[in-house]
Amino acid sequence: VDTRVRAGNWWGNGEPIFMMAVKHDYLIPAEQDPHRETDCAIRNVHIDGVTCMGENAMGIYGVDGNIREVELRNIDFTRKPSKNLPLKGNVFDFAPGRVDFEVPEDCGLYIGGGADVKLENINTRAWKIIHA
């Protein structure tokens, strides 16, 4: 996998591996707001044996622990320089959601929002793995 940041209105921001489980229904009138019966949005995902390069960090981001039983194994990641990242900001792309999150500059993999993720043999070189 080799990703890059594209200028303009383009979904994605150079994240080679990215999972998000955030609210996207902000424009729905209150009376039509969907009733959520499950407390889990992403579950039982296993990614194994991926070599990737990207202009942004990898990320797994949920809300209130709604990502569970995710496993990343044997991931080899190289973060490369980007001409376009300053144009869009050092952020993950949560479109069409409205999450505003700046990726730490020294980050290779960010796990947030109470996500339940197991890691095994993850090589991010000098970039940090942040499990917040």
Question: Which functions belong to the PLM regions below?
Answer:
Residues 1-132:
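Extracellular/periplasmic carbohydrate-active domains that bind, remodel
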